[in-house]
């Protein structure tokens, strides 16, 4: 993704050998490029997890 997705957007991010759905909770531009903080809830867990991804690894969910 060349631009930063809006906060609150539903996205898919790489996770293990596949991808998981999540929600954008913050974005920023760092010295390492554009970054996206995504909240995901993994299968079997009821606690959300946040992780940071490079913007080019994030896809808007359909």
Model-derived features with residue positions:
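Short intrinsically disordered terminal tails
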Residues: 1-5, 59-62
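Basic/aromatic-rich interaction segments and small domains that mediate binding to polyanionic partners
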Residues: 6-57
């Amino acid at each position: 993704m060349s631009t930063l997705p809006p906060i609150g957007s539903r996205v898919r991010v790489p996770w293990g050998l596949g991808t998981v759905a999540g929600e954008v909770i913050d974005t920023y531009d760092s010295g390492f490029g554009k970054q996206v903080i995504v909240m995901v809830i993994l299968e079997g867990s009821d606690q959300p997890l946040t992780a940071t991804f490079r913007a080019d690894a994030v896809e808007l969910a359909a």
